């Protein structure tokens, strides 16, 4: 019996990951699983550059557009969905493709088993943050969990509060919980790992062309559909690049040209952050290709 192959394809936005995955999936008779935290959401088909119907008709694609934009979909939920697929398709070769580095890390290393923090505890620490300020709470964190405190800025109120609320709710330091990881779904030695990194000038050109193409394909209709849902700005889907920019255009605060240029600028910045993250976080086992 031939063992199935596991392939991971990571890279910055607009680098051509989906095209490479489709090509390899046909060669390996594999299915494709999404590893991009924005492509999981429904409605934003064009804006998040999900695979087109012509591609999904050729090769089965999973975990694309299966989550309501009203939800906050976590890496833990993604791992649960992945595990179900791996159990269902035990003998089928699989290709994971996407630009969310944390998804790949969780897949290969597991994730910390941090318990749910009750809303009353979370609210307590957020009120204290507003009342006392980040630096005051940071001094408390230094006394409670110096390991975590030394990794974050004394001005980073959100991360300071997160560490304090976990300790308050569980009696254990966040640094302790971070070591209690789930068993990885995939052993790193079992996977072929590909990091697709285009030359920066070429990548930026691809980004610009893709956004122009999105306009032609009707991306503004998706933004209108999102606007009608009247979602909280704090939801992850509302932070997708293009949503704030094009909503500002629809509301009359930006010209169309300005909104499009802003979306291109934000996408370039995002791609640069992705490239930096991949270079620092992925080891030499990832095969670099352009």
Swiss-Prot record:
Monomer. HAMAP family: IPP_trans (MF_00185). Gene3D superfamilies: 1.10.20.140, P-loop containing nucleotide triphosphate hydrolases. ATP binds at residues 11-18. Disulfide bonds: none annotated. It holds the Pfam family IPPT. Keywords: ATP-binding, Magnesium, Nucleotide-binding, Transferase, tRNA processing. PANTHER family: TRNA DIMETHYLALLYLTRANSFERASE. Residues 36-39, 158-162 are annotated as: Interaction with substrate tRNA. It comes from Bartonella tribocorum (strain CIP 105476 / IBS 506). GO terms for molecular function: ATP binding; tRNA dimethylallyltransferase activity. Catalyzes the transfer of a dimethylallyl group onto the adenine at position 37 in tRNAs that read codons beginning with uridine, leading to the formation of N6-(dimethylallyl)adenosine (i(6)A). It catalyses: adenosine(37) in tRNA + dimethylallyl diphosphate = N(6)-dimethylallyladenosine(37) in tRNA + diphosphate. The gene is miaA. This is tRNA dimethylallyltransferase. Substrate binds at residues 13-18. The record marks 100, 122 as: Interaction with substrate tRNA. Its EC number is 2.5.1.75. Belongs to the IPP transferase family. Its cofactor is Mg(2+). GO terms for biological process: tRNA modification. InterPro entries: Dimethylallyltransferase, IPT, P-loop_NTPase.
